[in-house]
């Protein structure tokens, strides 16, 4: 994963998370989606009409706040340059900082990762984010079918998520060793029950996967399981012929449930190299492989150690948890050249802002203020770009991501060379 792609995706997700937390007092927050090709002059004309309509709002404060938000958007439109290749999204409104009377106008201009297709103007108590959230959904998915004579699991691997869709059991008894006509008849009944079970598995797989294939959201199907049943399933007429065309491979496995899915994903890693889950897993497993070497290998973890390695240009791959909610802040004196840098979490940042109101410069006694506040992962990504290191952000929702967050405090690295002998 390229550092710039990982950085942009992280910042986009962080922005959506922040916007989702904004709540207005009444229906005062405006969301404006401008599609590619829409003339800015037409949008401005529509907003002026909405400004006129807003004058009919009964509540004086709501009327004032809505009109102020529209005016803020109109001012931002003047700064946009046509043509808008992907369109643009603008959010504006009076957002309370704490209690009543603490409202402040906030305006956000977002360039979407993909083209906006529909013009939307919405005034509500919260920003309308669904069209942007759709961009975060992984478009491509892989179907997984694990099957043996006793049970089957049908699942979908999409981005970082493994979603188990169906679990089926056969009730087929094991083979009998005893001979005789009755034993042969019983064996035929067992084979028939196994055949009917595979038909049921195929039917459920068709129900789950065909709609995704028709929507062009299914890239392939992986089939696995212990024994020969998986081969019978693929070679027989159990799966729809269009789905059979996208069966990528079959895999010998020990399990047919959740453990089997993880076993299959490991064996299918070369086929799934573009799936986000596999990128995370590969990076974390590389790190752990280095970590358990007797000499410590090329592994490094902990904020101080990783930062040192980044500054030296020794990091090959930086692994950071998305839950690492920290900020890099610069504190400067308003009178002299005093400058201080700190790394703080969200609560510490709020506390620091309050403390600085009464703080004095240790150099000249002047007033201190925060002159720069940067998301910590954004700061780390810039260090990666300077040294050519790869950045991988991991979600705490995955097993590997949770390990990085909990066991290594959210930050780890694979080195190019050892920095301490």
Swiss-Prot record:
Q: Does the keyword Protein biosynthesis apply?
A: yes
**Oligomer status and interactors:** Heterodimer of two subunits, one of which binds GTP.
Location in the cell reads: Cytoplasm
Tell me the InterPro entries matching this sequence.
Answer: eFR1_2_sf, eRF1_1_Pelota, eRF1_1_sf, eRF1_2, eRF1_3, Peptide_chain-rel_aRF1, Peptide_chain-rel_eRF1/aRF1, Ribosomal_eL30-like_sf
Which family does the UniProt entry place this protein in?
Belongs to the eukaryotic release factor 1 family.
Q: Does the keyword Cytoplasm apply?
A: yes
Instruction: Give the GO molecular function terms.
Output: sequence-specific mRNA binding; translation release factor activity, codon specific
* Main location as per UniProt: cytoplasm
Q: Which GO terms describe its cellular component?
A: cytosol; translation release factor complex
User: What Pfam families does the database record attribute to this sequence?
Assistant: eRF1_1, eRF1_2, eRF1_3
The superkingdom of the source organism is Archaea
Task: Note the SMART domains from the entry.
Answer: eRF1_1 (SM01194)
Q: What does this protein do?
A: Directs the termination of nascent peptide synthesis (translation) in response to the termination codons UAA, UAG and UGA.
- Organism whose genome encodes this protein: Methanocaldococcus jannaschii (strain ATCC 43067 / DSM 2661 / JAL-1 / JCM 10045 / NBRC 100440)
Keyword entries, A-Z: Cytoplasm, Protein biosynthesis
Q: What is this protein called?
A: Peptide chain release factor subunit 1
